[in-house]
Curated annotation (Swiss-Prot):
Subcellular location(s) per record: Cytoplasm
PANTHER family membership: D-RIBOSE PYRANASE
A Pfam family: RbsD_FucU
Keyword tRNA-binding in record: no
Gene this protein is translated from: rbsD
Organism: Bacillus subtilis (strain 168)
Name listed for the protein in its UniProt record: D-ribose pyranase
EC number, as in UniProt: 5.4.99.62
NCBIfam families: PRK11797.1 (NF008761)
Domain of life: Bacteria
UniProt catalytic activity: beta-D-ribopyranose = beta-D-ribofuranose
């Protein structure tokens, strides 16, 4: 049994398989998942796991070079917007309209569905490299 890091075997495999510029999505409970994109559903009940907890764990495990979020998060979910800016203070954060954001999710390797019940609590993490 694994002692450290991500224990979810599906999520651990996706992260291990990522290459430079590959994308994964951290999604709230309501974000639609495009047909053909793998959904890793972590949701247990409203609020669990939270968007912030999930993003923090992924930030520890993944080389992230860029973050993409819906611009609407800044006005409608300031707590999570500030959280993203603090967590990814050394990475570029690009803001798009929510509709543009949803279109980009079709190119993701996976959508990780959380139990988050706040608006626009979604982001796309673009993989970087360690060298």
């Amino acid at each position: 049994m694994k002692k450290h890091g991500i224990l979810n075997s599906h999520l651990a495999k996706i992260l291990a398989d990522l290459g430079h510029t590959d994308k994964i999505v951290i999604a709230d409970a309501g974000l639609p998942v495009p047909d053909g994109v793998l959904k890793i559903d972590l949701s247990l009940k409203p609020g669990l796991p939270a968007f912030q907890d999930t993003a923090a764990v992924l930030a520890e495990e993944m080389a992230v070079e860029k973050v993409i979020a819906a611009a609407e998060i800044k006005a409608s979910n300031q707590e999570n917007a500030k959280f993203l800016e603090n967590l990814f203070s050394e990475q570029e954060i690009e803001y798009l309209s929510h509709e543009e954001f949803k279109l980009l999710t079709k190119d993701a390797k996976a959508v990780i569905r959380t139990g988050e019940f706040t608006p626009y609590a979604n982001c796309i993490l673009q993989a970087g490299v360690l060298f």
